[in-house]
Design a protein with these regions (language model features):
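His/acidic metal-ligating clusters that form di-metal
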Residues: 139-148, 159-198, 289-291, 398-402, ...
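Metal-dependent phosphoester-hydrolase catalytic domains
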Residues: 26, 125-126, 156-158, 168-178, ...
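Extended active-site neighborhood of metal-dependent phosphoesterases/phosphodiesterases
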Residues: 88-91, 110-116, 121-124, 337-362, ...
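Acidic, histidine-bearing metal-coordination/catalytic regions of metal-dependent phosphoesterases
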Residues: 3-8, 12-15, 23-37, 228, ...
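Active-site environment of divalent metal-dependent phosphoester hydrolases
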Residues: 44-46, 75-79, 105-107, 155-160, ...
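Active-site beta-strand/loop signature of hydrolases that rely on acidic residues for catalysis
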Residues: 34-41, 56-81, 147-150, 166-194, ...
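Structured beta-strand-rich core segments of catalytic domains in phosphoester-bond hydrolases
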Residues: 33, 48-49, 72-146, 235-241, ...
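N-terminal, active-site-proximal structural segment of metallo-dependent hydrolase catalytic domains
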Residues: 23-91, 104-108, 164, 243, ...
Length: 618
């Protein structure tokens, strides 16, 4: 790939493909935590006698709260020097302000406010009963939730009369509704008991909030409307130890929103590493989850498998790799993947979402003495969507037993999100939930920021990007050729050591040739991205290092890629001890069908127009 015209064509193809693909824009939704704070600021005057709006805003900014309910707020009063107090605080806290007047006061207004990092979709003011002074409820609606702020009357009768209004307002929304503020009632008062029938208190009422210097009571709260509480998990609360800025202490609550059930799975599962009486089911979730697989020879009598690490269920990440062992060769199995979002994982408590289940899929492992199979091999797709779609249509027609992507099909992953998107796109297109997939690493999979992380999204035979597996009585050996330039090339910045990696594979090859599975196989196939013979680059370290061992190896064929130009080299024509078939690339894409029937092994190479480029009995 050193020729200028070829490099230019490749870059153009890759840029076209990536520009037209949503892969680069694909991001995972983070688990959605919301921090709500309520604070009666006493119009900004602290117990030290200072009226300091910047101090209040600084406290809120430092807390990291997403939404703040603020009580006792002046607006352009004489007492505030004509200042818009909430806006002054909001500017310091870097939040959007919303003010609700409860009454006119001192040349301006007095009431409650809400501050938020996110601009509300709408804001609503609702009057509440108040004998000693007018009271008000301020509601801000956001995309996923609502937050309401109030400062209830000092009079119990007014408090009780306010509760039906609070309930009516909350019931008008079909999303989580939080109520926060200074309610002028203690936890044992009848007002709190009445409110708690329909609202769930989220802060620890044993943590005292008033007065700020020496608190002896709790009158500040954050609560959640119970009918909308099902998909909200309380993750903790605290009272901030601020003794001077106001006569109340700020109360902070953190909650987490569970993902909708339909969003828990990132994509359907995909099968990896079939063999030795087992197969690996891989999937990713959009949130931290506990996953397991239910499987059996029918859909009614199911076993359960999960991944354990030192006796613990592996549920600390969004990547899931579950091995199904003890399977009977030649038997059809059905399986589904199950997951529960973990909303809160503490030492002595855990909170889960609903159990979500995929649909049932099926697969069958080959018997050890099985002679017949069909495998489809493609290479150098380079994210070209039209080629992927065409190959997927062909795969649906050909119905191969398994599929090999022979390198540069998942090039240059920059992030885990991008790698996941591209892998799952191919897996979905090629029915990877029911057809085992082998992803062979090409030189372009080695490049970019997440290249060293992407292997965790696969389960390779033997645990390496090289290895061997048997399909019936045929042995397949996979080699990872590494990069196509020397390790000391400037573009690698001293981060590569593929010479050592190739030496490791030489030792693997020497051991593989001694293995019973290799020696007793009726046929043997070598898969590698860069051709060991027929590589058009002058730099060919794999042939230099492995060629001697492979000269004596009884392979029936080598299937390779990399050059983007289809060519077939019969054994002995270029020093190759066995036939070498090299697949085409973007603009001249090809696919290979390797089919075995009885003792006969047949290779067919076609382009995407369906033209047969080569047919050969091996």
């Amino acid at each position: 790939m050193k020729k200028l015209f070829r490099a230019t064509a490749l870059c153009g193809a890759c840029l076209w493909a990536m520009g037209s693909s949503p892969a680069l824009a694909q991001t995972l939704p983070e688990q959605h935590d919301l921090k709500i704070l309520t604070y009666n600021i006493r119009h900004g005057q602290g117990l030290d006698g200072r009226t300091d709006y910047v101090r209040i805003g600084s406290i809120l900014k430092k807390s990291g709260a997403d939404v703040v309910a603020v009580q006792e707020v002046d607006s352009v009063t004489n007492r505030s020097g004509g200042q818009d107090v909430l806006r002054r605080v909001a500017d310091e806290a870097l939040m959007y302000p919303a003010f609700a007047r409860s009454m006119s006061f001192d040349g301006g207004a007095y009431g409650v406010g809400l501050l938020a990092k996110e601009k509300p979709l709408s804001v609503k003011r609702v009057p509440l009963p108040g004998a000693e002074e007018p009271r008000v409820l301020l509601v801000a609606e956001f995309r996923d939730y609502c937050v309401a702020c109030t400062h209830l009357s000092l009079t119990p009768a007014d408090q009780w009369a306010s509760v039906p209004i609070l309930k009516q307002v909350a019931a008008a929304y079909d999303k989580p509704f939080f109520l926060a503020g200074d309610w002028n009632a203690q936890p044992t008062d009848s007002t709190l008991k009445l409110i708690q029938r329909d609202f769930k208190l989220l802060n620890n009422t044993k943590k005292l909030t008033f007065p700020a210097d020496e608190p002896d009571q709790t009158i500040d709260y954050v609560a959640l409307w119970r009918p909308t509480a099902r998909r909200v998990v309380a993750r903790g609360s605290r009272v901030i130890s601020e003794e001077k800025a106001s006569d109340h202490r700020p109360v902070e609550v953190t909650v987490r929103f569970l993902q909708p059930n339909e969003n828990v799975f990132y994509a359907p599962p995909y099968l990896q590493n079939p063999g030795n009486g087992g197969v690996t089911v891989m999937c990713q979730t959009r949130v931290i989850a506990h996953t397991w697989v239910e499987y059996g020879t029918d859909t009614l009598h199911l076993q359960r498998a999960q991944t354990l690490v030192g006796g613990q269920a592996a549920c600390h990440d969004i990547e899931h790799k579950i091995r199904l062992n003890g399977l009977q060769d030649g038997q059809t199995y059905y399986y589904r993947v199950c997951a529960r979002e973990i909303a809160d994982y503490q030492s002595y408590s855990k909170t889960f979402g609903d159990t979500v289940r995929s649909r049932f899929y099926r697969f069958k492992l080959p018997a050890a003495d099985q002679t017949d199979f069909k495998v489809m091999v493609m290479n150098d797709l380079h994210l070209v969507s039209r080629d992927e779609e065409a190959m997927a249509r062909i795969a649906r027609e050909e119905k191969p037993d398994f599929i090999c992507f022979n390198g540069d099909c998942l090039p240059e992953p920059s992030t885990r999100e991008e790698a996941m998107y591209n892998i799952n796109r191919l897996a979905k297109r090629f029915d990877g939930a029911q057809v085992p997939l082998f992803f062979i690493r090409g030189n372009h999979e080695i490049r970019n920021a997440y290249s060293a992380g992407m292997p965790s999204l696969f389960d390779y035979p033997g645990g390496h990007s090289y290895g061997a597996f048997s399909w019936g009585d045929t042995r397949f050996v996979i080699l990872d050729c590494g990069e196509d330039k020397p390790d000391d090339h400037w573009v690698y910045y001293g981060l590569n050591d593929f010479r050592g990696f190739r030496e490791e594979q030489l030792a693997f090859l020497q051991q593989e040739f001694k293995e019973k599975a290799f020696r007793r196989a009726s046929r043997r196939v070598l898969l590698c991205h860069i051709p060991l013979w027929g590589n058009e680059d002058k730099y060919n370290p794999c042939q230099d290092m492995w060629g001697g061992a492979l000269q004596r190896a009884p392979f029936d064929v080598e299937l390779s890629a990399h050059t983007h130009r289809f060519v077939y080299h019969p054994a002995g024509t270029i020093g190759n001890p066995f036939p070498v078939c090299v697949g085409g690339g973007p603009g001249a894409a090809t696919y290979m069908l390797l089919q075995k029937q009885g003792k006969k092994l047949h290779l067919t190479v076609k382009n995407l127009q369906g033209e047969v480029l080569r047919q050969v009995d091996l």
